[in-house]
Each structure stands twice: as structure tokens, then as C-alpha cells.
């Protein structure tokens, strides 16, 4: 059964689009995020938004997202920096699954060409039988912006070790292009 369902969306521009459509019904953001990436003296503003849509998600199904407006002009277009995307994060429970602690951390942080170090807390870890998973929702991620910049590759590391999901999309390197616009885990 669905315990919680969270809709995240965002894109390029300083005008936050806080009203979108999920499966034909309007959704209004309850939280928004903004961040600016500076590249060579040019500021690239981005926004993100969140809404709890648990009441609209009852189980497996197809979901359609529309109505997102982003800046596709200057300065984003000239630098291949236009971004738009959405993700539905669903937390479910089942008597056949073992008990798990679920932590959802959100925000918006640009990091191209620089390292972004996060130290999430609040985890409860058993002494044995550790079976952790991580999911990341990211904007951008096209191959043109996935090459190393300033000696920093697009990769996800845990305690210094680059993570590889073992899924190799043709033309990508999962260790160096972690944000390659793919869904890298099986859907349950």
C-alpha cells in the first residue's frame, strides 16, 4: 500500500512555476527551492518545487505530468543549460517486506564542475543485515554536460567510493555520468 507520494519538479529560470498538472488535476507546490549557478560570471537561476500527492496515488499506474513552464531563452539556451523535469517519489509498505527506515532529503543545489558534499543524518542502522538503497532526483544530466569540468566528474560517491548500479546505457559511463537522464534501478 502507498504510505506517501511526493511530486518534485523544477527547471531553469528565476520565475518559479508552482502550479503544474498531474494526471489532469492541478497541483500547487507547498515548498519551493531556488539556486543560482555561476559560470564564467553569468548567473543561471533554477527552481524546484514539492507537493505531497499521497491522496492522488493509490498504487501502480501511469502518471502524466504537464504544465511546467521554464526559461528556454537567455542565458540558459546559449549554454546548453535549459532544464525541466519531474519525479514522483512513492513510499510503500507491504507485510511481505522487511521493516525499513525511509529518509527523504530534499533541496536544490547546483554543482557542475565542483564537488557537492552532503552529510545526511538521522539514519538507524542495524548491526547486521544492512541493505541500504539511495535514489537521487536531478535536473539536467544530458551527455553534453556530463564530461569532467575542473577535474570533477559527474559521479555519486559513498564514503569516497564511486557507486555503480551495473546498468550500462549505451554511450554512457555509469561511474562518470551518474546523472545521465536514466532510471537506474528496477521499479518495485
Placement of each model-derived feature along the sequence:
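Cysteine-clustered segments with highest specificity for TGF-beta superfamily mature ligands
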Residues: 20-79, 87, 166-188
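A short beta-strand-loop element at or near the start of a globular domain
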Residues: 1-6, 65, 115-120
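Solvent-exposed N-terminal domain segments of exported/luminal and surface proteins
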Residues: 1-22
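Helix-biased "structured C-terminal domain" signature
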Residues: 35, 45, 84-188
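Short acidic, S/G/P-rich loop/turn micro-motifs used as interaction or catalytic elements
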Residues: 12, 70-71, 141-142
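Short beta-strand segments
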Residues: 8-9, 66, 91
Amino acid at each position: 500500500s502507498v504510505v506517501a507520494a511526493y511530486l518534485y519538479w523544477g527547471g531553469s529560470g528565476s520565475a518559479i512555476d508552482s502550479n503544474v498538472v498531474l494526471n489532469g488535476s492541478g497541483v500547487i507546490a507547498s515548498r519551493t527551492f531556488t539556486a543560482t549557478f555561476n559560470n564564467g560570471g553569468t548567473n543561471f537561476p533554477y527552481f524546484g518545487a514539492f507537493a505531497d500527492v499521497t491522496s492522488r496515488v493509490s498504487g501502480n499506474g501511469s502518471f502524466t505530468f504537464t504544465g511546467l513552464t521554464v526559461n528556454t531563452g537567455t542565458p540558459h539556451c546559449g549554454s546548453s543549460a535549459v532544464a525541466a523535469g519531474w519525479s514522483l517519489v512513492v513510499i510503500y509498505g507491504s507485510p511481505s517486506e522487511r521493516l525499513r527506515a525511509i529518509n527523504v532529503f530534499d533541496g536544490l543545489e547546483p554543482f557542475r564542475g565542483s564537488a557537492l558534499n552532503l552529510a545526511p543524518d538521522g539514519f538507524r542502522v542495524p548491526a547486521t543485515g544492512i541493505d541500504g538503497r539511495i535514489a537521487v532526483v536531478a535536473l539536467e544530466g544530458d551527455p553534453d554536460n556530463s564530461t569532467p569540468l575542473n577535474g570533477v566528474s559527474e559521479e555519486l560517491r559513498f564514503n569516497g567510493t564511486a557507486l555503480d548500479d551495473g546498468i550500462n546505457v549505451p554511450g554512457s559511463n555509469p561511474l562518470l555520468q551518474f546523472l545521465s537522464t536514466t532510471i537506474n534501478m528496477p521499479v518495485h
